[in-house]
Every structure is written in structure tokens, then in C-alpha cells.
Amino acid sequence: MDYNKNISGKYAGLMLFFFNVAYLLLLISTLMPYDLSKEILFISIGIMIFISSILTFVLKITEVDINIPNTITNCRLVLNIFIFTCILNIELNDSDKILLLVLLSLLLDGVDGYLSRYLNQSTEFGRVFDQEVDNFLIFILTFSLI
């Protein structure tokens, strides 16, 4: 299997946007099926649509290729949005579940960095995107202390 194939073209951002929606819905339905309120679902989707729209616009004007490490970073972005909405919802502020999600996000951070070096798919966009997703997680964790 050739892992050096990238998703390119003007539809890469749009495909990533729909991937975000599907991934978020899968995450919500898999991780916390019994505790979820409608507020979490709507807040998560709203934030994700806003951030994904910006990402789609950036990908369209810069014509950046999406590779495997960037896709994993994108998964971390959606996971971080879900963590943020779980922290915002006071009723679902279950620290054990949130801690597991944060650890999963940190694990994926290591995986995407390793894969970008191993597959030789490091890009300037990937470096900046990874750093911004890391900063978003730091913001979320700082916000949770308030």
C-alpha cells in the first residue's frame, strides 16, 4: 500500500469538513452514549463547523495537500472540540472520562509527529496545524481550571 499518496485538489478541504462531521458524530455516539445531552451535540457541531469552515477556506486558497499525519491532527482537533464541550457542560463534567480523552489527544499528538517523520510527509502546513491544535488543547485545559 502506498502511504505517500496525498489528498489534493480543490475538494480536499470539503472532504475534510465532511470527515470532521462524521468523526464527531462517531465520537459522540461511541464514547458517551448514555450521558450526552442535546446541548453537547449542538455545541460540538457548531464549534466544529466554525473551525472546519476556516480550515476548509485555508486549504482551498493555499492548495495544501492533506496527508496521513494531517488527517490525524484533524482528528485531534475534533477530539479537542469534544473535550471542550464536555468541560462546558456542567452535568457531564466527569473528570475520569475527560482525562481519558485528553490522554488520547496527547497520544495522537505523538502518533502524528512520528508518522510525519517516518513517512517523510512533514510539511509547513502540518507543523503549523499541529502546533495550533496543541495550543487549542492547552487553552482548553487552562479554561477547565477556571
Give the positions of each predicted feature.
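Topogenic membrane-insertion module of multi-pass membrane proteins
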Residues: 1-99, 108
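Acidic (Asp/Glu-rich) catalytic motifs at the cytosolic membrane interface
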Residues: 101-140
